[in-house]
Amino acid sequence: PVPVVVLDPVMIASSGDRLLQAEAEQALRDLVPLVNVITPNIPELAVLCQKEPAQTFDEAHEQAANLAAATGTTVIVKGGHLCGQDAGNTAVFPDGTCAHVRTPRLDSRNTHGTGCSLSSSLATRLGVELLQHTEAAEHTAEQGVLTSEDTHRALQWSTRWLHESIAAGAGLQVGSGEG
């Protein structure tokens, strides 16, 4: 199988703090077409698109669809930064189609690092999906090709895992800071 590359553009923390110098933003934009999937949070998506941060899912979806179409890269819209009961994630594919994975919003302060965790989980599951897809295809033209269905299944698994992890973390009561 060919490598699967997931880029988590760690540019802006949930607190709003910038983690990447503005001069490096174009370099990160230049990387996007070279990866399979990118997992920006809402403020990072806005920086990549050179727009204001989305306030609604529809605005985030529009930004992601434009970025995906322009780069040929699947963009994951992470619902954790948006309002509403659904904190799910959506894969927006370069052809404009999307696959949403619903998950209820949890009332938790234990969310520091969940974006990185989602990206790592997604990268792992995409590798599993690609391996299973490749084995099922045996030696056909589809061998080694990551499909939108593979990405959707990996996102379902990763979203469920992250939701369960956040829920389980609520009872730990460790540390004293945010997250």
Residue ranges of model-derived segments:
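Short acidic, glycine/serine/threonine-rich loops at helix termini
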Residues: 16-18, 86-90, 167-168
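A structural signal for small-residue-enriched, beta-sheet-centric alpha/beta enzyme cores
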Residues: 99-109, 159-160, 164
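Charged C-terminal helix
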Residues: 134-179
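Short glycine/threonine-rich catalytic loop with a Thr-x-Gly-x-Asp
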Residues: 105-122
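Conserved phosphate/ATP/ADP-binding segment of small-molecule kinases
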Residues: 22-98, 107, 126-152
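Glycine/small-residue-rich loop that forms an oxyanion/phosphate-binding "nest" at active or ligand-binding sites
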Residues: 1-30
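Solvent-exposed, amphipathic alpha-helical segments
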Residues: 117, 121-132, 161-168
